[in-house]
Amino acid sequence: MTNDMRQMTALGRNIEDGSFAVIDKEAGPHNFEPGQWQVVRRVIHATADFEFLKLMKFHSRAIQSGIAALKAGCNIIVDVKMIAAGLNEDRLRAYGCAITSYISDGDVISLAKEKNSTRAIESMRKAHRLGKLNGAIIAIGNAPTALIETARLIREENASPALIIGVPVGFVSAAESKEIILELETPFIVASGRKGGSPIAV
């Protein structure tokens, strides 16, 4: 590594550390547990939006369940490839984790057209058929219908993911889909309301 590369890396780290210091100061007192706060401050860092202090909701076992799943080499099922692109695949692969999105698969597209469904719904159904949901981390940042279908698969077809990250953004069904997840016993991390998006899921 050249000196310039080392300096750029150090500069980037200093900028990030400075950003987190600003977040910690401006956020002030909060009721998040330490592990939860690490998530919330990264969401604020990605969005520059302190409203997420009020929007982020955690199941009591969310952090420990997510960490345990990663250490066990879980599947990470995402609704859009943008989330997959933002994850550190090398680091996850070192734990044995695999990142998967079925939303662009030909059979998923065909089924969505045939059933007048959505690709997001059919992608989650495919993941369940293939046995990929049990013990998985499911990260939904774009498609509320994927989140709604995940809840149905849990309630009606005994899917048992380790953690649901439910942060779809939008005006139609986004807020409602998150409320459905909040009613589950399955560990979850949710950004309630309309706000969200793939950068938050990452």
Name each model feature, range by range.
Residues 80-156, 161-162, 170:
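Conserved mixed alpha/beta catalytic, RNA-binding, or beta-rich assembly cores of soluble enzyme
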Residues 46-54, 163:
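Short, basic, glycine/proline-bearing loop/turn elements
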Residues 31-45:
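N-terminal glycine-rich anion-binding loops that anchor highly charged ligand groups
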Residues 54-69:
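A short, well-structured juxtamembrane/interface segment
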Residues 1-34:
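Charged, compositionally biased N-terminal leader segments and the immediate start
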Residues 162, 172-202:
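C-terminal functional extensions of proteins
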Residues 76-78:
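Short hydrophobic beta-strand that contains or immediately precedes a catalytic carboxylate
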